[in-house]
C-alpha cells in the first residue's frame, strides 16, 4: 500500500475479507494509514534482505507512492512475479517493471468482488511475522535521525499526525512502528523538500491534535518562510535534524565515494546555520539537542501540550547518520544461501582474492 487517506470501515472490511480467502500479507508503511488484519510494517525487514525469503507470486498495489526505496530495490530485482495495479485512474504505472494487469476501479470494489467464502491457510503472512519477530530495533545507535526515531516512536501521543520530509526521515521512521491511531503523510510526489513546513501548518489548522514533522536542514530552510504565517496554532511540533548539509545525498551515494566527491556538489554543505533566531522571532518555543543527554531533557516538552508551537533542533553529524543506518541493518541482516557462500569465499580469499576471482568469472 502506498500513500493513502485513512481507510474507512467499509474499505477495511473488504480488504480483510479478501485476505481471509487468500494467502497474502498487506505490506504497509506510515503513509499507508492502514492497520487492518494481516498487515505488517515490513520496511526494516525488507531493508535487511527479507525479500530473499519472502518472494511473492503476485504483487497488488493500491494508493500512491511509497517513498520506500528498500522495497523498490527488492521487488525490481524479481523476475517471476506479476504486478496488478488497482486504481480508479487506470494509469499504467509500472513501478517495478513487472506490470501485468490494471484494474480501473476503487480499491474497495476490487477487494469486495474478489473476496470469496473459502478460507485458506496463511503461511505466507506467518513467515513474515516469524522473520519480523527476529528483528532487534533496540540496539545502541549513534546520535542521529535514526536515534531520534528510536527514542520517540513509542512516545508520540495517540491520534497525532506525523509528517515526514523525505527521504531520510521517512526511511528512518519507517523502521519503527507507531501507534495505529497516528496518521502519516509526506510530500512524496515532490520528494519532500517542496513546502513540507507549509503543509504541516495548513494541516494543523484542521485539528487540535499534535501535528509533528520530522525534517532535515535543507528541507526546513527551503520552506522556512512558512514559520512566519500568522496565527500558527500551538499544536505544531517541528523536529529539525540539522546535519550541516545533505547527509542523505552522501548516504545514498556511498558506493561511489571513491569516484565522486558528493560534498563538492551540495551547495549548502557545511552551512553552519541554525533555526534558533528565526524560530523565536516567529513565536515558536525553541529547544536544541547536541547529544543524547540534552535530547532526553527536551523530549518531554516536545510531546506535551504547550501554549505555543515548538521546534526542536537536533544537531547531528553526517558520519553518524550513515553509521546508524549501517548498524541497524547489519544487526538484523537476513542472509540467503547464496549470501552465505559469498561470505565464506570472501573470508577465505580476502578482498583481493575475491576481486581476482570476479575478474576470472567475468572473463
Regions found by a protein language model. Give the residues of each.
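Glycine-rich, anion-gripping cofactor-binding loops and their flanking helix/strand elements
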Residues: 2-84, 179-207, 221-224, 290-293
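Short glycine-rich anion-binding loops that position phosphate/pyrophosphate groups of nucleotides
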Residues: 3-6, 31-32, 63-67, 89, ...
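Alpha-helical scaffold segments in soluble metabolic enzymes
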Residues: 17, 73, 113, 150-155, ...
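Glycine-rich, acidic loop regions that bind phosphate or pyrophosphate groups
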Residues: 27-129, 230-231, 238, 244, ...
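Short acidic/His/Gly/Ser-rich catalytic and metal-binding motifs that mark active-site loops
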Residues: 36, 131, 171-174, 247-250
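Structural motif
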Residues: 58, 161, 210-212
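Phosphate/pyrophosphate-binding active-site segments
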Residues: 76-168, 292-363
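Thiamine diphosphate
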Residues: 175-363
Amino acid at each position: 500500500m502506498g500513500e493513502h487517506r485513512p481507510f474507512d470501515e467499509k474499505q477495511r472490511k473488504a480488504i480483510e475479507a479478501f485476505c481471509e480467502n487468500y494467502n497474502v500479507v498487506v505490506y504497509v508503511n506510515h503513509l499507508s494509514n492502514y492497520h487492518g488484519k494481516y498487515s505488517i510494517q515490513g520496511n526494516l525487514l525488507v531493508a535487511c534482505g527479507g525479500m530473499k525469503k519472502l518472494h511473492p507470486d503476485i504483487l497488488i498495489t493500491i494508493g500512491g507512492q511509497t517513498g520506500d526505496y528498500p522495497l523498490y530495490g527488492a521487488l525490481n530485482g524479481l523476475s517471476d512475479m506479476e504486478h496488478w495495479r488497482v486504481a480508479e485512474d487506470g494509469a499504467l504505472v509500472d513501478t517495478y517493471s513487472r506490470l501485468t494487469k490494471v484494474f480501473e476501479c476503487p480499491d474497495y470494489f476490487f477487494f469486495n468482488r474478489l473476496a470469496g467464502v473459502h478460507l485458506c491457510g496463511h503461511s505466507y503472512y506467518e513467515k513474515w511475522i516469524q522473520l519480523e519477530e527476529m528483528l532487534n530495533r533496540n540496539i545502541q545507535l549513534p546520535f542521529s535521525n535514526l536515534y531520534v526515531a528510536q527514542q520517540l516512536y513509542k512516545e508520540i501521543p495517540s491520534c497525532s499526525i506525523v509528517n515526514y520530509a523525505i527521504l531520510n526521515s521517512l526511511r528512518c521512521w519507517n523502521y519503527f512502528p507507531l501507534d495505529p491511531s497516528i496518521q502519516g503523510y509526506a510530500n512524496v510526489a515532490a520528494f519532500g523538500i517542496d513546502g513540507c513546513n507549509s503543509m504541516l501548518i495548513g494541516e494543523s489548522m484542521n485539528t487540535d491534535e499534535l501535528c509533528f514533522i520530522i525534517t532535515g536542514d535543507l528541507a526546513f530552510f527551503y520552506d522556512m518562510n512558512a514559520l512566519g504565517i500568522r496565527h500558527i496554532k500551538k499544536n505544531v511540533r517541528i523536529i529539525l535534524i540539522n546535519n550541516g548539509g545533505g547527509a542523505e545525498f552522501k548516504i545514498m551515494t556511498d558506493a561511489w565515494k571513491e569516484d565522486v566527491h558528493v560534498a563538492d556538489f551540495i551547495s549548502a554543505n557545511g552551512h553552519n546555520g541554525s533555526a534558533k533566531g528565526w524560530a523565536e522571532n516567529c513565536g515558536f518555543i525553541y529547544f536544541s539537542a547536541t547529544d543524547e543527554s540534552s535530547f532526553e531533557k527536551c523530549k518531554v516538552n516536545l510531546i506535551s501540550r504547550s501554549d505555543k508551537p515548538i521546534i526542536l533542533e537536533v544537531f547531528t553529524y553526517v558520519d553518524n547518520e550513515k553509521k546508524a543506518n549501517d548498524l541497524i541493518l547489519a544487526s538484523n541482516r537476513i542472509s540467503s544461501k547464496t549470501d552465505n557462500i559469498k561470505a565464506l569465499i570472501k573470508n577465505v580469499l580476502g578482498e583481493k582474492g575475491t576481486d581476482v576471482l570476479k575478474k576470472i568469472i567475468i572473463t
